[in-house]
């Protein structure tokens, strides 16, 4: 038991999934095919075949394949190229002749005869490949494609609150496809129903219905509520009583039961829905209809006599005369439609039109300015909603439409149907009558996630469609007798479209690579922004807010601060995305009151009708729920229900939070705002050179480390055969299936955010490892657990004002021991170009540069690895040819001394910029193809090849030793059938005899079973050749040239490691949103100290806790103090040799951790003591989110460690030695150093560049800017009346260009007379006024008086 085990206070019942599975599965479905994302072959099949349009030829798709990438992932980063693989497709060109083949129904040939068929494999372009960690390498930079949350295809119903005038809500419906035109329906203030296509000008819905081929009779049948009136024997008309039709109606006649003649309700009463249902329940089925009410109603069907004669056509409005004559007409029943509430019918009556008018009107709206015909309008309308080429709902949209309207269409039908439109209109009409509810657009059942595979699908399709258009153009001019398929393909089109997406899309982002947590969080991010998404400027509060359906799917805590809050979210730790793009979360089945271990995933739609209890529900040993009434969620409301009705249970209390939030212990005790900050600031933590896992963790640290890809994990179980600083070789122990896995460690590799990626081996030679074991730690990882910071002894105390306003006081011991020292890599690039005057040259011989700045260069002019460099040092010496000019006497002298070179070139070397100093850790030299490698490039190539040869030799040595060990087992104990000194024929072969023979000669010994030995030798030779072949390919890649930009001959990259120690001004934080800036580093002897003389490491302000309401940090401090002192106690007992007490103490610590106790009970006393040695630094504990230790458990551990259960200690002032007045909260807390380093922010300059317009210093460190005397500084001098100082500041000391030169001359001459000129900023202001047609000129006092007098006379009109 080599690794330490955290003390858990809960049980992990459900293991965590692959944390970057979202990215990997989505891209895999694009490459190999999936449920919603089409594969590459499917997209080819949907675009091809491409015909020339004249029936002469057709280009068909046969198959495609992806090749192998030219370089590995790191090789692409080094060379600044894209990690991609070539895509090749086999296309078949079918050429048709003039004659035709086949016969139609009348014996006439119908199909053209095939004249020729030509197949060819064609290079279609390079497709970026996803790395094993779920990222893409584009132009040498790691990028992540962020998943996007968008509105799911389908129909949505809402009300338009913004356009409501009278207080009555007008409802709208919108059918949104995945690809194609939007169809909107809306009511105006007069209850007229309109529709829009793609948000263009609206038209009455009559036009759409007519275009769909509906007559008035069809409209009555589809949309109108028809009342059938029957004539009784006594000559009265009756109508069927339907409660929904009478809801809200004020009676205009007495309501009389037609069956009993009883008066049910008197005239004038208003019928509510409750009253109507009660009347129906009491037996009211038919009631008498007043003839006056039938007036102004419309006939829903032709009024036909008993003889079949049409008396009145359908759609006729009944008048007084019609009503009066009804009893005399020969009819016994009529079907009537009331205008009120039948919005579709009323719209048709107001805006009626013919089929042709409807088609032409729709065409004019969609394509204004064009002259339509009925045929073209029909084609356009058909293509808008009913053509698979232009309209696509996806299977998601079809499923949602089927579920909404109870339809049964197949999933493969992804275009609209007439039935979909009819159902939408009917549902909207019901909503306008206040029947039903609108959709919640923020419900996760109405929003789906698009991932990288879907984006690639779309881009690939766009590229192929563009390519198809080019193919058609090329076919028009092609000679089909000789043309080949490759001549019609432009392979750059597809690559350009995909490259444009990765380079310019808002969802293809520069990966946050500050630490492993920031990487994994970026890959699990879900954005509502981007193409087709929301706009941060117009997104309202509702869409940003936490929704009930986010439970277990989207983290309610982690989101950015600022303008994008709520629009960018993170997946919850257990959440996954199903094949339709909906987010699902896992639940355990509950059957007959028993919580089982069977797990299922539910989407937000599936969860609505389920009864779900919490993970913390009380159960007995067999899993049965103890309580009779259980607190559950049903339809997103909290209710108490009987345990027999519970259907599901949460898998874990932490399933509602994201990866970053799950790393915060005691999260439940923090305010939500501070928890948000804590989640975000963990991603800003800088990896330290000596990382330390937190004593108080959550148990998620190991899962995050593995999921991030920063560690090296064993692919298979085996034995570690070889280890050095860069390589680990693991081999199998199996005799039947032998393999060798070689792992290469990253050393001083630069991340996207200039942090150092450095891996360290954690196994030893001969160690047995299992599949999934960690072989090497990465940055910010210790023993396979995430380690973003350090555990410090903290005191919450005000100390001489230095921790005012969240400032932090640090002990000098922290700096001395390099606890928060980090290494950052800065990359510098020098490009050698071929100029029109000749090529640039890299050399150490740079004229005009002092030798002290060239000390780190080798003989080739490039910095040596390991050299310490300071600001101003030359990293790469480079000279550039310069044009000829008149030669000065000094240049003539240089020419005479140094030759022609002295005047022909200028210095263009790469210098280390100001503010940077460090050690050169790596140099890369890239040379253009076709140029012979010389100098340092050959040396670097040789080093790389030697490193590969060393790896190869180690693998071959492992293989050889293994094979010869098997051969030895086959030979020993057998009788030799041949003689090979010192073994004679007939001798029994022994190990001693074999050792005297060279191993290469063992194959010559003949024994029984020689066939198995020959088979072993063949396996050995094959595996040997395979390893050699692999490394020969690697050698060729190393020796290969690089593809550089036009005109570039060579690129030299120099990487400098910069060491950042902790200093005042650096930003630090905890995990609870508690952040501050270091104000002072105090000598350890002046820091407050404990009774045993231990000084505290850090002092925090206690006032920062209650107002921020992040009490979790106090609980962490107390639990950390217990864990820290338990480690000290164990260490003391080990040093004393009191092993029995060590064992009893360890057992007492872990007594509530069932899994750990089971492991300890299986261990011997010696093994327990050996394990306890790993606890010297403290007993690591896991305070899981919502399942952490209670107060009594923390107090138990504090007492066990021999500390006050209050968590407070007596402190002494390190300066005076006096005891503080009261006890102080002291503990062990995990602190992080954030990447807001003071070295990156503060700079100074004495001289530098000026702005060309204002002649004032530039601003900011990036421009090497300086200080300018600004507006507020002028106010300060004005306030003191310092006129002369102000005049100097605004002129010669600022932007008076001429004055600056004159002052310099005056100083040189010893003259104290300064002459002030006009500041350049004043000239800028005058030019701006002139741009406004206001001329400003300088003039003397006399001229001013004369000009003002003339102006006054002109103004008076004299």
From Swiss-Prot:
Keyword Transferase listed: yes
Gene Ontology CC entries for this record: DNA-directed RNA polymerase complex
Keywords of this entry: DNA-directed RNA polymerase, Nucleotidyltransferase, Transcription, Transferase
Superkingdom per UniProt: Bacteria
Pfam families given in the database record: RNA_pol_Rpb2_1, RNA_pol_Rpb2_2, RNA_pol_Rpb2_3, RNA_pol_Rpb2_45, RNA_pol_Rpb2_6, RNA_pol_Rpb2_7
PROSITE patterns, alphabetized: RNA_POL_BETA
EC number: 2.7.7.6
GO biological process, one term: DNA-templated transcription
InterPro entries: DNA-dir_RNA_pol_bsu_ext_1_sf (IPR042107), DNA-dir_RNA_pol_bsu_external_1 (IPR019462), DNA-dir_RNA_pol_su2 (IPR015712), DNA-dir_RNAP_su2_dom (IPR007120), DNA-dir_RNAP_su2_hyb_sf (IPR037033), RNA_pol_bsu_bac (IPR010243), RNA_pol_bsu_CS (IPR007121), RNA_pol_bsu_protrusion (IPR007644)
MF (Gene Ontology): DNA binding; DNA-directed RNA polymerase activity; ribonucleoside binding
Catalyzed chemical reaction(s): RNA(n) + a ribonucleoside 5'-triphosphate = RNA(n+1) + diphosphate
Similarity comment text for this entry: Belongs to the RNA polymerase beta chain family.
Record's function text: DNA-dependent RNA polymerase catalyzes the transcription of DNA into RNA using the four ribonucleoside triphosphates as substrates.
Subunit note: The RNAP catalytic core consists of 2 alpha, 1 beta, 1 beta' and 1 omega subunit. When a sigma factor is associated with the core the holoenzyme is formed, which can initiate transcription.
PANTHER family: DNA-DIRECTED RNA POLYMERASE I SUBUNIT 2 (PTHR20856)
Protein name in UniProt: DNA-directed RNA polymerase subunit beta
Protein encoded by which gene: rpoB
């Amino acid at each position: 038991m080599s690794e330490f085990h955290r003390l858990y206070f809960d049980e992990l019942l459900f293991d965590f999934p692959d944390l970057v599975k979202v990215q990997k599965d989505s891209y895999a479905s694009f490459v190999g095919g999936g449920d919603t994302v089409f594969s590459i072959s499917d997209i080819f099949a949907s675009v091809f075949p491409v015909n020339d349009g004249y029936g002469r030829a057709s280009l068909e798709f046969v198959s495609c394949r992806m090749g192998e990438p030219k370089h590995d992932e790191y090789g692409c980063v080094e060379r600044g190229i894209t990690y991609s693989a070539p895509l090749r497709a086999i296309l078949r060109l079918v050429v048709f002749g003039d004659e035709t083949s086949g016969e139609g129904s009348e014996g006439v040939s119908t199909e053209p005869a095939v004249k020729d068929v030509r197949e060819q494999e064609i290079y279609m372009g390079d497709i970026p490949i996803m790395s094993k960690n779920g990222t893409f390498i584009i132009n040498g930079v790691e990028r992540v494609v962020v998943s996007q949350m968008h509105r799911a295809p389908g129909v949505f119903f809402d009300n338009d609150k913004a356009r409501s005038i009278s207080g009555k809500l007008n409802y709208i419906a919108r059918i949104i496809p995945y690809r194609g035109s939007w169809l909107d329906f809306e009511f105006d203030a007069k209850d007229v129903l309109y529709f829009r296509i793609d948000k263009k000008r609206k038209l009455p819905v009559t036009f759409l219905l007519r275009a769909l081929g509906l007559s008035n009779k069809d409209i009555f049948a589809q949309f109108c509520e028809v009342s059938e009136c029957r004539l009784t024997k006594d000559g009265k008309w009756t109508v069927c009583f339907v409660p929904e039709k009478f809801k809200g109606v004020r009676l205009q006649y007495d309501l009389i039961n037609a069956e009993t003649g009883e008066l049910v309700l008197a005239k004038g009463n208003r019928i509510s829905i409750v009253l109507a249902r009660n009347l129906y329940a009491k037996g009211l089925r038919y009631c008498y209809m007043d003839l006056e009410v039938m007036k102004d109603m419309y006939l829903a069907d032709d009024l036909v006599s008993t003889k079949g004669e049409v008396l009145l056509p359908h759609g006729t409005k009944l008048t007084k005369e019609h009503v009066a004559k009804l009893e005399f007409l020969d009819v016994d029943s009529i079907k009537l439609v009331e205008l009120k509430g039948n919005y579709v019918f009323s719209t048709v009556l107001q805006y009626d039109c013919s089929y042709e008018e409807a088609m032409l009107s729709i065409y004019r709206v969609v394509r204004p300015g064009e002259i339509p015909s009925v045929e073209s309008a029909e084609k356009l309308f058909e293509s808008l909603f009913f053509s698979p080429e232009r309209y696509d709902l996806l299977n998601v949209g079809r499923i949602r439409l089927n579920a909404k309207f109870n339809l049964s269409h197949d999933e493969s039908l992804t275009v609209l149907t007439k039935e979909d439109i009819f159902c939408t209109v009917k549902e909207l009409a019901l909503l306008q009558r206040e029947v039903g509810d609108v959709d919640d657009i923020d419900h996760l059942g109405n929003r789906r996630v698009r991932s990288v595979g879907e984006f690639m699908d779309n881009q690939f399709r766009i590229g192929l469609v563009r390519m198809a258009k080019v193919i058609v153009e090329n076919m028009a001019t092609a000679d089909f007798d000789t043309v080949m398929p490759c001549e019609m393909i432009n392979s750059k089109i597809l690559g350009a479209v995909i490259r444009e997406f990765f380079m310019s899309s808002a969802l293809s982002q520069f990966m946050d690579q500050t630490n492993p947590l920031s990487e994994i969080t970026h890959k699990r991010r879900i954005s509502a922004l981007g193409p087709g998404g929301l706009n941060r400027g117009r997104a309202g509060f509702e869409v940003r807010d936490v929704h009930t359906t986010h439970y277990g799917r989207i983290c309610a805590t982690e989101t950015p601060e600022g303008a994008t809050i709520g629009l960018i979210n993170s997946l919850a730790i257990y959440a996954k995305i199903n094949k339709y793009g909906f987010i699902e979360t896992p639940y355990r089945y509950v059957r007959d009151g028993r919580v089982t271990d069977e797990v299922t995933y539910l989407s937000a739609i599936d969860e609505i009708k389920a009864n779900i209890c919490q993970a913390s529900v009380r159960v007995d040993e067999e899993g049965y729920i103890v309580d009779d009434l259980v607190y559950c969620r049903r339809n997103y409301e909290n209710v108490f229900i009987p345990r027999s009705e519970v259907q599901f249970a949460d898998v874990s209390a932490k399933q509602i939070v994201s990866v970053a939030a799950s790393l915060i212990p005691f999260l439940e005790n923090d305010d939500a705002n501070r928890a948000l900050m804590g989640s975000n600031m963990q991603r800003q933590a800088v990896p330290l050179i000596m990382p330390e896992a937190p004593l108080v963790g959550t148990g998620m640290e190991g899962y995050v480390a593995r999921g991030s890809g920063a560690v090296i994990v064993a692919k298979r179980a085996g034995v570690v055969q070889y280890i050095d600083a860069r390589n680990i070789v693991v081999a199998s122990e199996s005799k039947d299936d032998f393999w060798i896995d070689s792992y290469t460690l990253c050393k001083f590799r630069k991340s996207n955010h200039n942090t150092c990626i450095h891996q360290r081996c954690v196994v030893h030679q001969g160690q047995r490892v299992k599949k999934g074991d960690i072989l090497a730690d990465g940055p910010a990882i210790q023993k396979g657990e995430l380690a973003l910071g350090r555990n410090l002894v903290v005191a919450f105390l005000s100390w001489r004002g230095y921790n005012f306003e969240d400032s932090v006081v640090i002990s000098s011991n922290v700096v001395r021991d390099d606890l928060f020292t980090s290494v950052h890599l800065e990359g510098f690039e020098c490009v050698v170009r071929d100029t029109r005057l000749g090529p640039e040259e890299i050399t150490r011989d740079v004229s005009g540069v002092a030798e002290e700045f060239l000390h780190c260069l080798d003989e080739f002019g490039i910095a040596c690895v390991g050299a310490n460099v300071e600001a101003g040092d030359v990293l790469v010496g480079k000279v550039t040819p310069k044009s000829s000019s008149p030669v000065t006497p000094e240049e003539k002298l240089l020419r005479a001394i140094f030759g022609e070179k002295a005047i022909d070139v200028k210095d263009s070397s790469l210098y280390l910029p100001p503010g940077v100093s460090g050690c050169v850790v790596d140099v890369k030299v890239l040379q253009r193809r076709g140029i012979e490698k010389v100098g340092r490039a050959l040396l670097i190539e040789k080093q790389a090849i030697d490193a590969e040869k060393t790896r190869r030799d180690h693998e071959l040595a492992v293989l050889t030793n293994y094979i010869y060990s098997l051969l030895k087992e086959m030979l020993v104990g057998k009788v030799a059938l041949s003689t090979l000194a010192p073994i004679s024929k007939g001798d029994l072969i022994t190990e001693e005899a074999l050792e005297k023979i060279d191993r290469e000669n063992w194959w010559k010994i003949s024994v029984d079973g020689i066939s198995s030995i020959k088979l072993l030798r063949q396996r050995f030779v094959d595996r040997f050749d395979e390893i050699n072949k692999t490394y020969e390919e690697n050698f060729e890649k190393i020796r290969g040239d690089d593809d550089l930009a036009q005109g570039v001959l060579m690129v030299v990259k120099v990487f400098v490691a910069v060491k950042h120690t902790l200093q005042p001004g650096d930003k630090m934080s905890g995990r609870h949103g508690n952040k501050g800036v270091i104000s002072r580093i105090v000598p350890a002897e002046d820091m407050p100290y404990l009774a045993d003389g231990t000084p505290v490491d850090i002092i925090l302000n206690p006032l920062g806790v209650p107002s921020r309401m992040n009490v979790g940090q106090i609980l962490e401090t107390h639990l950390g103090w217990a864990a820290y002192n338990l480690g000290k106690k164990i260490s003391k007992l080990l040093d004393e040799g009191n092993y029995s007490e060590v064992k009893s103490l360890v057992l007492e610590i872990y007594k509530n951790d069932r899994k750990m106790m089971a492991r300890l009970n299986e261990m011997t006393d010696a093994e327990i003591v050996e394990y306890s040695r790993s606890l010297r630094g403290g007993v690591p504990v896991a305070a899981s989110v919502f399942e952490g230790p209670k107060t009594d458990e923390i107090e138990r551990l504090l007492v066990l460690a021999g500390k006050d259960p209050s968590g407070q200690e007596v402190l002494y002032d390190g300066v005076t030695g006096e005891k503080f007045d009261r006890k102080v909260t002291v503990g062990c807390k995990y602190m992080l150093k954030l990447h807001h380093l003071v070295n990156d922010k503060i700079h100074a300059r004495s001289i530098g560049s000026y702005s060309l317009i204002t002649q004032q210093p530039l601003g900011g460190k990036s421009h090497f800017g300086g200080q300018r005397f600004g507006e507020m500084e002028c106010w300060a001098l004005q306030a003191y009346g310092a006129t002369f100082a102000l005049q100097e500041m605004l002129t010669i000391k600022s932007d008076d260009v001429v004055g600056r030169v004159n002052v310099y001359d005056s100083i040189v001459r010893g003259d104290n007379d300064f002459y002030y000129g006009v500041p350049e900023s004043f000239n800028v202001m005058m030019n701006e006024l002139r741009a406004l047609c206001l001329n400003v000129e300088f003039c003397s006092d006399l001229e001013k008086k004369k000009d003002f007098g003339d102006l006054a006379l002109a103004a008076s009109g004299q």
